[in-house]
Amino acid sequence: MVFGSRPPALTEANIGDQSGKVFIVTGATSGYGLLLSTYLYQNNGTVYLAARNAKKTAEVIADLKQRFPASRGRLDSISLNLSDLSTIKKSAEEFLAKETRLHVLWNNAGVMFPPAGSTTSQGYELQLGTNNVGPHLFTKLLYPTLAATAKEAPKNTVRVVWVSSDAASWAPKPAIDFNNLDYRRNESDRSKYGRSKAGTVMQAVELARRARKDGSGIVSIALDPGIANTGLQRDMGRLMSTMVKLIANKPEIGAYTQLFAGLSPEITAEVAEKEWVVPPGKIGCPRRDLFTDTETSRKWWEWNEEQVKAYL
């Protein structure tokens, strides 16, 4: 989705003082995640950069501290590999050993069009495992802390933000094929990626429903950051990469969209069950079955629960 004439609702210039708030951004060392982390830190937020490469994360933190010496925020790192479920509990514990509050979790990390046959450590197709199963486990492990924070924070301000894509519309109907989650019957690259991003939306919506029912006060919202030339496209072919460059927004637009999803007062629990966020930061209409097919969402959530239970 290409950004038109409407200016972003929230930017680094107007999100206000984030002092006292604790955030986690996954995939925080490049692309949208890096920009988002930058905006939060320069406005005095405590930001945990969750990423795989510890050396790169340390370099990013050092750079941000040098660029924004006046920030009263704090930066820290979490080693996070979403493609290996056996490591994710340790990642969550790394955070929980330091913090008792968490205001917003941005599930931003993901993969797109990896080499054919790529799988996670547990054997899931790489996009399914990294974009869906891994974030499910990480979110589940942090959920009690989010819920505890929501009891003290203003209503609708504690959130889980799930970064999907307009590519969710590429998923065939029904969006989740429970008889082919191992892809023993091969599908196109477009279909596999689309299903993973449709799955992200359905995880967000199902968590929103469950959070309302359990009274936790957590808002769970999905978003489409738009098209930008970020590190996510590193495994695309040359033709696709060229097309992306021709139609892409600046990466800042995707980061502003994420700011809106995580911080805008327009986002409420009621909105999150019915709509998602689109560039450059506004409530938009997604593919409707991803929100209305409650039976598939429930089964999808329960399938993910089954996959992660051995790693809690």
Swiss-Prot record:
What are the positions of the active site? 164 (proton donor), 193 (proton acceptor), 197 (lowers pka of active site tyr)
One Pfam family of this chain: adh_short
- Listed GO molecular functions? oxidoreductase activity
Which of the seven top EC classes does this enzyme belong to? oxidoreductase
Disulphide bridges = none
Task: Please list the residues that bind NADP(+).
Answer: 56, 108, 140, 193, 197
Pathway assignment reads: Secondary metabolite biosynthesis
Instruction: Name the phenotypic consequences of knocking out this gene.
Output: Abolishes the production of Aspernidine A.
EC number, as in UniProt = 1.1.1.-
Mind listing the UniProt keywords for this protein, alphabetically?
NADP, Oxidoreductase
The cross-references to Gene3D superfamilies, in alphabetical order and at most eight, read: NAD(P)-binding Rossmann-like Domain
- List residues traversing the bilayer: none
Gene Ontology biological-process annotations: cellular response to farnesol; secondary metabolite biosynthetic process
Family per record: Belongs to the short-chain dehydrogenases/reductases (SDR) family.
- Free-text function comment from the UniProt entry: Short-chain dehydrogenase/reductase; part of the gene cluster that mediates the biosynthesis of aspernidine A, a prenylated isoindolinone. The starting point of the biosynthesis of aspernidin A is the production of orsellinaldehyde by the non-reducing polyketide synthase pkfA. Hydroxylation, methylation of one of the phenol groups, and prenylation, presumably catalyzed by the prenyltransferase pkfE, would be needed to yield aspernidine D. Subsequently, the cytochrome P450 monooxygenase pkfB is responsible for hydroxylation of aspernidine D to yield aspernidine E.
Protein name, as recorded: Short-chain dehydrogenase/reductase pkfC
